[in-house]
């Protein structure tokens, strides 16, 4: 809807000023968070972290299209979307600090714990959406995944099941061009990910993942279609991951870093939004700086809350595997705790 210079391509008349400014505020908010989280990991204050810088428009545009009671199934790289959907910033940081409390969403929010194994959350989302259909609600689900996930069996099983039962789910792919170090050209022979929808007779949409307006519009349309009984949609949001796969990765070993540098100046979602606001005479530098400083203050408070959290109970590693503790785990737990007591 808007090009790299912030010029309107297909018109943004359906978006009011308040929503556009909120897009920008949220884009800035999650980028500030992402950069701070990388810094925290480098300082040893959280564990290995998966940055999402460059993918902000895909996450904000899709998350803000959801209704309050909808379901969200994120991956380990979609904490920006989770934050935009109302997840607690403290709990997101607790997750990256290795705490199970970080998987708990705010009261009334249907946010699944981040999917770490690739694509496993896709059948979960199809099932949750089907359950809402069976209950007769108007709730829909969105599930996030990367390009690499489309090579997994769970991707195909989830789409196949959702297609058969017409589950109200949006399969939201963020095509950031790399599955860790494997470029898209070595992952698949299809020209697009969106065309994979043809095998399941569901709509497939390819959208500029760095255009927050376009992402919001297409996700909103897919969710509305799902609520009205039209079934699932596959959305491919074409974007770019600027940084490493995780903070344990060195992207310089497998791709030209100059390419990322060039793309940052050309397709960056925040720069694009900023240019659009300027073209519309809506950009206020003082307001933009305030949005950034407010985000930084929110993050600092969340960090303080995370670091003040009581120490983890070592027994937790045994208590959340099965609904009821089975005897081998019970024995292991008792042995482990006795060893801790004697240390």
Question: How should these model regions be labeled?
Answer:
Residues 5, 76, 173-176:
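Short, histidine-centered active-site or binding-site loop motifs used for metal coordination
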Residues 32-35, 39-167, 183-189, 194, ...:
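Cofactor-binding active-site loop characterized by glycine-rich and histidine/acidic residues
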Residues 76, 237-239, 321:
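A general secondary-structure junction signal
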Residues 1-58, 243, 250-253, 257-343:
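Conserved acidic/glycine
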């Amino acid at each position: 809807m808007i090009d790299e210079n912030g010029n309107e391509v297909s018109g943004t008349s359906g978006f009011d000023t308040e929503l556009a400014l909120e897009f920008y505020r949220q884009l800035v908010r999650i980028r500030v968070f992402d950069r701070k989280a990388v810094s925290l990991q480098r300082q040893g204050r959280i564990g290995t972290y998966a940055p999402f810088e460059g993918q902000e428009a895909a996450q904000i545009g899709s998350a803000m299209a959801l209704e309050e009671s909808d379901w969200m199934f994120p991956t380990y790289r979609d904490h920006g979307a989770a934050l935009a959907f109302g997840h607690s910033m403290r709990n997101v940081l607790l997750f990256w600090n290795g705490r199970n409390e970080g998987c708990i969403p705010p009261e009334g929010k249907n946010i699944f714990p981040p999917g770490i194994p690739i694509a496993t959350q896709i059948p979960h989302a199809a099932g949750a959406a089907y359950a809402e259909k069976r209950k007769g609600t108007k709730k829909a689900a969105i599930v996030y995944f990367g390009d690499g996930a489309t090579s997994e069996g769970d991707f195909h099983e989830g789409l196949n099941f959702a297609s058969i039962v017409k589950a109200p789910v949006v399969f939201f792919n963020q095509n950031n061009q790399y599955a860790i170090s494997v470029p898209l050209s070595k992952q698949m022979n299809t020209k697009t990910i969106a065309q994979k929808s043809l095998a399941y007779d569901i709509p497939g949409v390819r959208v500029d993942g760095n255009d927050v307006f376009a992402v919001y519009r297409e996700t909103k349309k897919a969710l509305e279609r799902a609520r009205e009984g039209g079934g699932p949609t596959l959305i491919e949001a074409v974007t770019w991951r600027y940084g490493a796969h995780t903070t344990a990765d060195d992207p310089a070993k497998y791709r030209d870093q100059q390419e990322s540098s060039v793309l940052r100046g050309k397709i960056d979602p925040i720069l694009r939004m900023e240019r659009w606001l300027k073209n519309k005479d809506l950009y206020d530098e003082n307001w933009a700086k305030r949005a950034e400083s407010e985000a930084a203050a929110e993050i600092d408070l969340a960090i303080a809350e995370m670091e003040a959290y009581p120490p983890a109970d070592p027994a937790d590693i045994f208590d959340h595997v099965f609904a009821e503790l089975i005897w081998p785990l019970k024995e292991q737990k008792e042995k482990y705790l006795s060893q801790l007591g004697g240390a």
